[in-house]
Amino acid sequence: MNANEDERLEYFRTLLAERFELAPEDLRPDARLYEDLDLDSIDALDLAIVIREVTGRKIDPQAFHQVRTVGDVEREVRRLLVNL
């Protein structure tokens, strides 16, 4: 990833913490979205919106369905940024 992609990923983490009222230290790569962070299906829709805000692209529904952890989300954000 280049510096711009790193900045966007950091911006994504900040948005994630703010939007879902999470402590930044809770956004560990292994943190499970539903079980550990207590996100629900409405939050999942908001998460897709945050991903689009950061990358300018919609996440593929199939890929989004497989996202379970913060690390999974970050990998998808990186993939979308690389493929800009």
Regions found by a protein language model. Name each.
Residues 1-25, 78-84:
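Thiotemplate assembly-line natural product biosynthesis machinery
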Residues 13, 30, 48:
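Generic structural marker for isolated residues within well-ordered, non-membrane alpha-helices
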Residues 18-38, 55-63:
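Phosphopantetheine carrier-protein modules
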Residues 25, 45, 70-71:
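Residues in well-ordered alpha-helical elements
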Residues 41:
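Catalytic nucleophile serine of serine hydrolases
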Residues 44-66:
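Phosphopantetheinylated carrier protein domains
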Residues 65-83:
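C-terminal structural segments of small proteins and small subunits
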